Amino acid sequence: MKEVSEKITERIRKLIRLKESATQIGSEGEAHAAAAAGHRLLMEYNLSLLDLAGENPQNRLTACESDRISYKDAAGNIWKRDLMRVLCEYNYCKMLLYAGTTHMVVIGTEENAATVIALFDYLRKTFRRLSEEKYSGYAQGRRGYWRTAKGKKDYIRSYLEGCIPGLRMQLEN
């Protein structure tokens, strides 16, 4: 990890304060620009908000654990687990799996964990809906295997598993 100077951490703190004050006065553009600049520096130096809290215990952010979330799915379990892993990676959280089950939990600050869970629910539903829509269009021009229940399941599983690398590429940019 890069050695981060106090100058960089202080700059990020100033950007966070600027974002908060701009939000309070209703300047959405300025708040968004400050948040984007702060996020860019956090990503560049591989930092999280916990790294900026310093030694003062009252400034420390507390970690929390989400409720158990099932990643069991008729189209295969891998895509949901990978979706959660990507969302946690880009939202400063960790995902833990319960051994011998199809359950996982999110560990992170309350705000970050809530963001990950909300994104997971939204993207899970959206990817499922899109997979059905794409299959309908794909199956119209096909015969045989791709019109069977197994062909549909294979298509949807492949589509869902392919969504995750695409999401990762979008989050990297």
Named regions from a protein language model:
Residues 3, 39, 43-173:
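Long, charge-patterned amphipathic interaction tracts in eukaryotic proteins
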Residues 28-37:
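Short, charged, amphipathic alpha-helical segments
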Residues 8-22, 41:
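Non-transmembrane amphipathic alpha-helical segments
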